[in-house]
Amino acid sequence: MTYSFVVCENLPGLTIVAEERLDALADILGQYTVVGKTRGSDLAGSQYRSPFAVEVRRPVILSNHVTVESGTGLVHCAPAHGAEDYNAFLALDPGSFRSGLLCHVDGEGKFTDDIAEVVGDSAAKELVGQDIMEAGSRTVTKLLKAVGALVKVQRIRHRYPYDWKTGEPVITL
């Protein structure tokens, strides 16, 4: 996959988008100029800053479940909460399973204190105890907007497991 570095009139800094997604995202990006391109493999190992806790740096990793079929061609990774993310995490460092796997959701589907390791202490205060599928999701959206990291809110239909008896979502822990 090839990625474009774009400067958008309505967004600060550089935005990275899969080249094949630029046309599909034109309405969201607004007027933009491509200022560079790179292969996805060249991004591997580089780091990005969390929009919540800028002192936290995370590695860019590659995974074959990221495609140009939808979105930007970039996704976040939550290895404690899904098979694709878990496999990408293990491929990054097979020995890191015990020491690096962070689960910030409890058995009731609510954010725990461990969320601070992902979003920082300030944002964690607003998230701890919130249901991840309801109030927690709304709070994450609010927090992203507050730090200028939210470009668009849109409902996306995801394949997601539901318990056949209760109709409730199944959260992988």
Name each model-derived stretch:
Residues 1-5, 45, 55-57, 70-173:
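Residue patterns forming the tRNA-binding/recognition surfaces of aminoacyl-tRNA synthetases
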Residues 2-74, 83-87:
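Protease-associated
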